[in-house]
Amino acid sequence: MNPRIETLQTLTYEVTGAIARIILNRPERGNGITLEMPRELAACVERANLDPDVHVIALAGNGSGFCGGYDLIASAEHDMEGIAQPDAPEGSPLDPMVQARNHDPSGTWDPVTDYQMMSRNLRGFMSLFHSEKPTVCKVHGYCVAGGTDMALCSDLLVVEDTAKIGYPPARVWGVPTSALWAYRVGPARAKRLLLTGDSIDGTTAAEWGLASEVAPAAELDERFESLLERIGRVPINQLVMHKLLVNQTLYSQGLQATQAMGVFFDGIARHTPEGFAWQQLAAEKGFKEAVRERDEPFGDVGLG
């Protein structure tokens, strides 16, 4: 009997044996992050943690890549109708209309409203990190911008050798809210990426210690499944204790305070003079053209 795949608004969930599988499922938009995705992610992670049959949580993306970051076309172009979501609590920080008004260059920016939204998104991503059970992320194609928040919040990465991983919004209009780059690759390499907005391929990610496994596309699924199966053989109690033990190292290094700064800085980055200018460019010429003009001088147009 085949396991039943449950389809939510932004992802799918299923359990096969000892593995809970969460698949980002917006391939037509590059699995772009919406306000709903972090909350659905957290709900699925909690469900897996409460399932006595699940030992390990697998995260992957449907389509040509893992995740291209936030789905910003409507918001960056200030298309109020394009981002309306009738199921969002009206007037709340999660109401896209509230956030659209808060990003209007002609209006007044409320940093607390911004923080309330982005901190909740971060909580959703960090559910992978806080999960008692281990989380393993498969990266293929592209994993850029906000997509790296989900990947870096996972315990282990299995990546395609040619995958592109990075944070291009470091050039304008963004700061990584998870603030995990320095913890995952060290301060010097984190600065190398964030001070340029450059990306690395999967092979480099493995060399830097960011990825635990790397494989060509034809072998990626096999390598991913092999690791999941090995983890799935370990008793849940052992997995929980060892993950908590290692995570405590990051807690003691000030991760929570660093992330609070990352969330605030991300909001500020979207409201600096150059941030407003870039948003105005997106409103006038379209989001894709604004990204092209941002990235073309660096020779890597189209990475996020």
Regions found by a protein language model. Give the residues of each.
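Crotonase-fold acyl-CoA enzyme core
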Residues: 126-239
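Charged catalytic carboxylate motif
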Residues: 36-40, 120, 127, 223, ...
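Terminal peptide-recognition signature
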Residues: 22, 26, 40-41, 59, ...
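Glycine-rich, phosphate-binding/catalytic loops in enzymes
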Residues: 38-40, 73-77, 168, 175
